[in-house]
Curated annotation (Swiss-Prot):
Source organism of this protein record: Caenorhabditis briggsae
Cellular component terms per the entry's GO annotation: cytoplasm; nucleoplasm
Principal location class: nucleus
Protein name: Muscleblind-like protein
Lineage: Eukaryota, Metazoa, Ecdysozoa, Nematoda, Chromadorea
Example GO molecular function: zinc ion binding
Length: 299
């Protein structure tokens, strides 16, 4: 059975052990101050008017005697009367001696009040410990994190739910490797083309500057001289030099977006521009038109 005095005695050591905490004053107020709100009972309004036809054993509201103080339509029950030990007769007790059905309801209210008080004290005690030992809480949290395994944890699979991809995509990895290899190959080809062009330029600089046979052939008119007997070997060398010089594009850093992907891949096939000097089959051929006046054939 509920006993307020026994509850106060049982919580005295707890309050004394928490005296060193910053919330000791609040704890003492919670445990030592007696709250009598759970002992209050509503008075029957019809009884106050003198119109209630029920007796005090049948009415669910209180029928207080004249010696009991009524405040705002409510009276306070005698705790000693609930425990069966009230001996006040002269003068009579100023608190209500409730009947049995009201006494049972007051005992239920007392148990609920005690549970609420214990819950409040536990929350205050927990909050005080967190304020006193913040470093201890951080150490405990770090220890709990270290206890976690370093391996990858796979969540439980449920049907009908969409999950984010955890394992890497093999197709994406293969495409990235191919793109990297193509980029490295393109850079190597550009470097080799630049070195070959530099070597040819160095060899040509040692010889005296002479006009190119291909340029001389282009300046001459097609009707005056036949270009089929030209120096094919010299024209082929000159054409190779021009192709190497045209292919030597300076290496630039690839442009990247925010995600790290390349905006323009150097390995992508590029459409070469048309250059009539790079034609191997038609060396030195430039179409010309005669400007001389030609007489019409006689009829």
């Amino acid at each position: 059975m509920f006993d307020e005095n026994s509850n106060a005695a049982g919580t005295t050591p707890v309050a004394s052990s928490l005296a060193a905490t910053p919330n000791a004053n609040l704890m003492s107020q919670v445990f030592n101050v007696k709250d009598s709100r759970w002992l209050q009972v509503e008075v029957c309004r019809e009884f106050l008017r003198g119109q209630c036809a029920r007796s005090d054993q049948e009415c669910k509201f209180a029928h207080p005697p004249p010696n009991v103080d009524v405040q705002q339509g409510r009276v306070t029950a005698c705790y000693d009367s609930i425990k069966g030990r009230c001996t006040r007769e002269n003068p009579k007790c100023k608190y209500l001696h409730p009947p049995q059905h009201i006494k049972d309801q007051l005992l239920i209210n007392g148990r609920n009040h005690l549970a609420l008080k214990n819950l409040l004290s536990a929350q205050i005690n927990q909050g005080g410990n967190q304020m006193i030992n913040p470093m201890l809480a951080l150490q405990q949290q770090a220890a709990a994190v270290n206890l976690l395994p370093n391996t990858q944890m796979y969540p439980q699979y449920y049907n009908g739910m969409m999950y984010q991809q955890v394992l890497p995509d093999p197709y994406a990895a293969a495409a990235q490797q191919l793109q990297t290899a193509a980029l490295l190959g393109n850079v190597g080809g550009l470097l080799s083309a630049q070195s070959a062009a530099a070597a040819l330029v160095a060899n040509s600089s040692t010889q005296p500057p002479t006009p190119s046979p291909l340029l001389r052939l282009q300046r001459k008119r097609a009707l005056e001289e036949d270009t089929s007997n030209g120096n094919d070997r010299t024209a082929a060398a000159h054409t190779q030099l021009l192709s190497l010089a045209a292919g030597a594009v300076p290496v630039k850093r690839p442009a990247l977006d925010k995600n790290g992907a390349m905006l323009f891949s150097p390995a992508a096939p590029q459409t070469p521009q048309f250059n009539p000097y790079l034609l191997q089959t038609l060396q030195g051929y430039v179409p010309t038109v005669s400007c001389e006046y030609m007489q019409p054939p006689p009829f």
